[in-house]
Amino acid sequence: MKRSSFWLLIIFLITGTIYYYTVDNFSTTGNSIKKIEVLVIRAIDGDTLEIEGGERVRLLGINTPEKKEFYANEAINFTKQLENKTILLEIFDTDKYGRELGYIFLNNKLFNEEILKNGYAHFYSYEEDKYSNQLKKAESSAREKELGIWKKSENFGCLTLLELKFEEDGNRCTNKEKLTLQNTCNTLNVSIKDDATHIEHVLIKSGLYEKNYSCTWNDAGDTLFIWDKTGLLVFERY
């Protein structure tokens, strides 16, 4: 082998090794996936963890109640069982906050699924993946059993959704979103929430209820949750 060819081969091998090490083992963006065993330091909330090294992990496929919302304490207490335990973390991506996005396995069980099964979260996903159907089935089971956030109020059935309009003209935040409900019961003291973190507390009197919104309802279609003052489900559009 000529000397020049020999050195070209060496350079190629070194470059390929560096590329493999960098892309396959460190990148967590796009379609890159990796599995690692990590120690959980603490549960920040029901769907966010701090792991060894100070990194944060956001559990994919679920959305648990935020602090001060109904069942927020139950959700975080459920997730606290991961503290000081070594788990298998399957990373799919990293979000804009620098959090690892992924799925957690403890004792060979998908923890994201366990939260849904117990009714401490609802299914929430920007993009379908290999676990989506599994998570949807877990959520359906909790809904049928009326566990956690799915436990129904005695006033469930009082409200009928007549309209949930988003801003169709593409101009965001112009107060053209509209929610219209029909209440066949007495005045209801409720909390209204969308698929994200928008929540408000209102009184819905008997009869027609209408309200305009801005920058709230998802243009691609949104969920609507309504709970009574004790945290029981009054209405859902899901």
Language-model segment annotations:
Residues 1-238:
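Small beta-barrel nucleic-acid-binding modules, primarily SNase/OB-fold domains
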